[in-house]
């Protein structure tokens, strides 16, 4: 089992490394293409472990996600589009499973940078969510929204899942958190990207950005992610990645760590 878990951790690390790198309520922003125009995600999250003996009791994630973004188009935005891929993932999982249905990912509340509640609407495709901005966002202006969010994490083998018994990919009681948070959709040719979600292949895209997550996980869990990880004295994890399209997190208590020194000969 030790060898298997070491191999599993190496495979997970390879997957994470493969992720592509790429007043007023508003503020002026730098020219398009600069670091200041990219979306920034600041996520505070709590992961509750699942019961490995009862697959009906799913793992659960609650979080607050603050997205800072710039209108990089030539149009004025009165609303923005978010993609909630966790909701689409759970909706699809329910459609193919006879087990107890999972509760789809849910945006509880959206606020502007001043703490005022914003109206939002979930479309027929549950992954598409429109948020009404408090005032029109002109080209080049930057603002932020704060999102309270929660989702169950299904027992399956998907981008968002938990594995109770381990397999060739993940160790025992491993949680995979990919697309476990709302993201700003891509705005192209005067409209927001509403391409449908499906499990096979890469069906989604959104602007590259910076991510910082503060994650509270079960005490015995190891956490690895796209970018860097640091654990504080109180057990919380700080995870950071810059200029990436997707920010993935793997957590579990079945991993082993391996360290080595690489010597270069001349």
What are the residue ranges of the model-derived segments?
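Ligand-binding face of N-terminal immunoglobulin V-set domains in extracellular IgSF glycoproteins
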Residues: 77-81
């Amino acid at each position: 089992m030790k060898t298997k878990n070491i191999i599993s951790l190496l495979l997970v690390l390879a997957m994470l490394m493969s992720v592509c790198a790429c007043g007023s309520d508003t503020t002026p922003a730098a020219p398009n293409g600069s670091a200041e125009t990219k979306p920034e995600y600041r996520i505070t999250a709590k992961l509750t472990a699942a019961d490995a003996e009862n697959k009906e009791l799913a793992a659960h994630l609650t979080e607050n996600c603050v997205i800072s973004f710039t209108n990089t188009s030539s149009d004025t935005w009165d609303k923005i589009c978010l993609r909630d891929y966790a909701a689409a993932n759970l909706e699809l999982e329910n459609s193919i499973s006879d087990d107890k249905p999972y509760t789809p990912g849910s945006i509880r509340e959206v606020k502007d940078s001043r703490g005022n509640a914003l109206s939002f609407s979930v479309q027929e495709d549950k992954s598409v969510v429109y948020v009404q901005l408090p005032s029109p966002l002109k080209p080049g202006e930057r603002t932020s929204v704060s999102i309270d969010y929660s989702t169950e994490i299904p027992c399956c083998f998907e981008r968002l899942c938990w594995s109770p018994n381990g397999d060739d990919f993940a160790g025992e009681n491993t949680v995979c958190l990919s697309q476990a948070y709302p993201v700003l959709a891509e705005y192209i040719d005067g409209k927001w990207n509403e391409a449908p979600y499906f499990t096979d292949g890469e069906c989604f895209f959104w602007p590259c950005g910076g991510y910082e997550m503060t994650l509270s996980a079960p005490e015995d869990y190891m956490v690895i992610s796209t970018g860097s990880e640091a654990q504080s004295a109180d057990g919380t994890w700080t995870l950071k990645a810059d200029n990436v399209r997707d920010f993935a997190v793997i957590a579990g208590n079945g991993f082993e760590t391996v360290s080595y020194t690489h010597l270069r000969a001349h």
